[in-house]
Each structure stands twice: as structure tokens, then as C-alpha cells.
Amino acid sequence: YRTMFEALEDVLRAKGNRLAELRDTLLGTMKAGFRELYPVRFPWLNSTQETAVNKVLCARDVAIVHGPPGTGKTTTLVEAIYETLHREPQVLVCAQSNMAVDWISEKLVDRGVNVLRIGNPTRVNDKMLSFTYERRFENHPLYPELWSIRKELRQLGGRARRGSYDEREGIRSRMSRLRDRATALEVQINTELFDNAHVIASTLVSSNHRLLNGRRFGTLFIDEAAQALEAACWIAIRKADRVVLAGDHCQLPPTIKCYEAARGGLERTLMEKVAANKPSAVSLLKVQYRMHEDIMRFSSNWFYDGELEAAPEIRHRGILDWDTPVTWIDTSDMDFKEEFVGETFGRINKEEAHLLLKELEAYILRIGGSRILEERIDFGLISPYKAQVQYLRGKIKGSATLRPYRSLITVNTVDGFQGQERDVIFISLVRANEEGQIGFLNDLRRMNVAITRARMKLVILGEAATLGHHAFYKQLLEYVKKVNGRQ
């Protein structure tokens, strides 16, 4: 947190430099500039992805790649980075989490990009370990000599404490020469590692690492920017001449554990602010490659002004003939009740969980067990509440009927499903009370994630009598009824 405060202080104090210009452009009234460049064609991208990459290439100050669910945001961002490297020798690529940094780094490595991963190696995934600074340093051709010198220095240090005065003087002289050589080797290794890297990749906080002191970058790319704290973004922006933000501020925001901090504005991200302040910098990716169009359409209408479209090859994808892609199972007449089990785990609705598992088993039976195993048809069970998730996991573990399919069934919270997809998704909304209270189901970004994870079949279980008081859920109910999915 100290690093974030220091970054914010630098931003506030900035005057007459590039950081001040970026601050006034991103958050103030200074106009975002764009170069006049001849558009680059990318036949393997769709038109909105191509437009987004070209906007990144033209931007003098800031560009935003707004990637709704399934629209190929990562593909677009990798292409933008790859193309930028034809114009700049090196870029900085950051994200809030190590997982997100590793994900984009893996995609860049697959494209043949030389990535140098900065950060704690224990938090880096196995595939990216060989690209960490520490591993690259140890694998450098000059490292054996440096290791040998360090070993000799340790041995000489022991002898110096035991020897005579004349011996100690000779040893100290030798140690001084060795230290100078070791320093020269370290500098040479570091220089070669950083000069040869096309991409320096780190979390936003780790961009303040001592190894990056004094280094500047023409372009900073921030992936999953909609989940990044604004203060963390400024840590990295201090090192850059321009910034590219990629993400979706209509999905999950950063995790803020302090309710007062969230209410005070910490939950509102830099990407959200810049998208509102500089709409000319935003490129919306409009073609999605995940969902049947009936699953996609409600999210598109509510969150993205109806601008999303399903790619032709997946527009009518399905598992069963004569099946409805979206189903809402209304539990209003079933007398189900939620239970509060504590602040940590939230609420549970056991009867709704039992019904969900019954519906899951019935759907598996309709598809056919052998087909599910042969085609690896996978299922996701989502609930906003940890207690419901744990209860469902326990019931699945004890179910003999579901045992053959356990490896194909994932149960998690909405947050745990961010960035994932499954062939079939069941959502348990849990809330069922006479007061119409829905708690943090009021956070519609969370629901946007939940209803956009399914490729071919989405089943929602919830009490319409409770949820229907909220305009979002009322319209979702009406939409599902319209596409003939309501039961």
C-alpha cells in the first residue's frame, strides 16, 4: 500500500512532465491524441478486433480495448503488443494479479516474443518459471563465473578472519578485485537480459521493482484493467509515455475488503473513469465466440447497448435438438427459504441446491452418459454465495449418480468463474425471502459474469417473487420467458 500512496503522491505533484500530461488526459480535460496512420490489415481478426489494434497503434496517450465476454480480448491484446513491438524495441505489460500476468505472458511466448518476467518466482506458474528474471540470470553464460567468484569470496572471508596481518592485507586486496569483477558481471548480465527482452512483464505493484528503477517504456499495456486498483495502475504508468488498458468494466471489479473504502470510490477503476472521460479512446469488441446467441443477447442488451453479436459458427450451437438455450426455474411456489450462515460464507438455500442437482442429473440423463464422457461435455455450477457452493460440492461428492462425471463438473462462486466457460451452466441465486432483499446480487457486474459463462445451455434457479423486485432480474425473467425457457 505504501507503494500505491507514493505513486498517487507523484501523480498529484506532477507538473510539466509526461506523468502530468497523462494525468490530465486520462482524468482531466486534455484531449487524447491519435496519429494519422494507414490502417494495418489483420485478416485473422474480425473487424472490431482489427479496429482496436489500429487504435492502439495510433494512440499518443491512451487506448482502451473493451472486451465483453467471449470477444477475444486476449487475442486482440496479444496482437496489439506484437504489432507495437514492430515499432518499439520494448514494452511493459502488467496486470493486477500474477495469474493474469502469467496468462498474457504465456500467449506472448507462444507468439515467439522474448518475455522477461519480473516478480517473486514462487508466485509464477510452472510454464513461466523459465522466463523469470531469476531463472534467466542463473542460465546466463556468464553466471558460472559469477557463482565461482562468489564462492571464492566466501572462502576468502573465512581465511581473512584467521590469517596474519600480511595475509589479511593480501586477501582483502584479492577480495576487492573479485568484488569489482562480480559487480561488472552482474551489470553485464542484467544489461543483456533487459536489452534483449521484448516484453517486461510484472504485476502492477512489482513494476516498482528495483530492477526497473530508471527504466522507461514507450507503451504500457495493462491487462484485466477493470479488476485493477487505480492506485496500482499509476505505479506502472509513471514509467510509460502512453498506456493501453484492456478489460471489461461491466464484469467483476477489484476485490475491496473494506466496505467504507469501496463506498469511498476505491472500487471505481481507472479504466472505468477513462472510458467515461475519453470515449474516443475506447474500442468495443463486438463479436463473441462463446455463447449461443440467446444466451448472449440479454447481457448484450443490458450491459453493452445491444452491440454484441454471436459469431456465425456458434450462433446456434447446442447440445440437444429442440432444447432451449436459456431456462429459468422459478422456485416461488416451492416454499424454499434462504439461511444466513455468517459473514464469511453468506447464505445457503438447501432446497434450491437439491433441486439444482436433480435438474443436473435429469439433463445428464437426457444427453446420455456415454456421450458426455466421449465428447467431454463439461458443466459449471455457480452461486454467488460460498455456503451454497460448499453445500453443492459436498452433495456432488456423495452422489453415486454423478460420480462418473465429477471431473467434468466445476462448482464455484461467480468470482471463481471469472474468465472461464463451460458447455452447460447452472446458477443458484439462493435468495428467497418475503422482504425482497437480494444483498450483493445488486452488483449486476457479478451477474453479468454468471450469465455469460455458458456456451450452449444456461439454467437459472431462483425465486422470482424475491428477485423480481429488481429491474434487472425482472427483465431477465421476461427475456427468458420470451425465448421459451421459463418453467
Regions found by a protein language model. Name each.
Residues F42-D61, T76, S202, I348:
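N-terminal pre-P-loop "Q-motif" helix
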Residues A63-G67, V91-L92, F379:
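Conserved beta-strand position immediately N-terminal to the Walker
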Residues V78-L220, A232, K257, M271-E272, ...:
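Alpha-helical nucleic-acid-binding subdomain
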